């Protein structure tokens, strides 16, 4: 093998495995056909922070305190003003491991949870916080308004809540509920516009520009580990329906087929756009020589639900729409694909990607595999919701606002720990005593509608033992 192989990971945030069956994504489908395609990899967590932390450290989500704690009621988890440190400074990450063997490590992230300030970039020599720069560029006015709260920290947020609560005591219950919903809808509309609901691009162009800048100015032609996060597939979407997850999850709005289909169509539009941006990034890396001797990995951190099991989006129970993600590995020599055309449909633990990349970088293997296919059991862990930032306000309002009460209850009910355990085609949903466990035969029941645990008790006991 000619020197150390470059390793490039393009992580397509929020892309579920089944999206690979859609039309209009020629680049992704061609790469899957010509490389090694793991059609049903299993995300270790149900939202960005736990999945990335697990992937970077080769640990299960529940073994990482910074991402498995209860975030319900923690204002610092708000995506617009994240102040959490998800990893402690002593963690050994895949980036730090590769740095020690001579790799130049670079993170380009368009995700607010994956930045230089959250410690998920631990070990990377170069970090480009694309999300921050992209959102300030598009939303200078909003950034200035939010800076008052950001700089004031939690005390500023609590003062704002307290002032709001005192004002609401003067209103009759009916008027308070109307006012809460009116303000919530206006806030959601504002955030939706700020996040680029009507734009297909949510920062992919800026991420690719940052990649070009890095390769032109800092690329040292030594072995490279480049990790990019694209967030185009994340809500909010170009769709003419309400986008507030918790209005649907609480039953205030009906998540009917029309709404679910409109949101899903917007989701697929973004993925089709992202397909073109992936092509652009690959062309950039070919021109710079990064793909002269490299493995390109394309995957996701979690999927997205659109009405299945009456759920919307992610950071929820690890049903298939959330837990299953695509994983594609393609080897390049002299800028051209070494066609392998291998497909693997069994469950693959995404946190084991850490070891597989390490094997690849150290020369122990020449293709991505490592521990990926060898696991008897694979798990995906939901340790609670990520949207807990408004718990204080909801708790204050719920005695006098029926809508706030319903949203609070919906968040509370989904803030329970659930672990999915895979063994071949069988999947166990373990609820830790909150309710009866469920087991599904995914070969015959891919929609997870028929609980077969009562006729598979012996296997269920073995699988439940894997849910720590």
Residue map of PLM features:
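Catalytic domains that recognize anionic headgroups
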Residues: 1-468
